Amino acid sequence: MPGYTVLLDNDLFLAAVTKQARPILMDIAHYERALEIRSFGLPKSGRTYYRPRPARGKYVASAPGQAPAIRSGNLFRNEGLPRFVAPLTVERVIDTEYAAYLEDGVPGRLAPRPFIAPAIETVKQRFAAGQLGRF
């Protein structure tokens, strides 16, 4: 029985895959970011507070399990844009010191207000359902 060997040029293969995958990865990262930002604006069912100066007015805080409410806009404004840190690796930094506390909570002090994990889960579900392409 005749046989053959296929030799793959790793650099050429990586370049071809990268060229096709990078736009898709960037679309996915932007879609995930948009889901997070959208979750901040959803109706909240927590307590009503007065906004600190200079914003003034009232706002309804998020209840445990809901995405954070927009109070000062700092978390919303510091949702970083995605960037490539390796050929097929996208990174996005949320440059707010309390983002992790809101996402994960603080035992005995603050219940989680997740906004990252639900967005990632939505992206994973769309990916698994074959809803690829332009997000």
Regions found by a protein language model. Give the residues of each.
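Short, Lys/Arg-rich flexible segments
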Residues: M1-F135
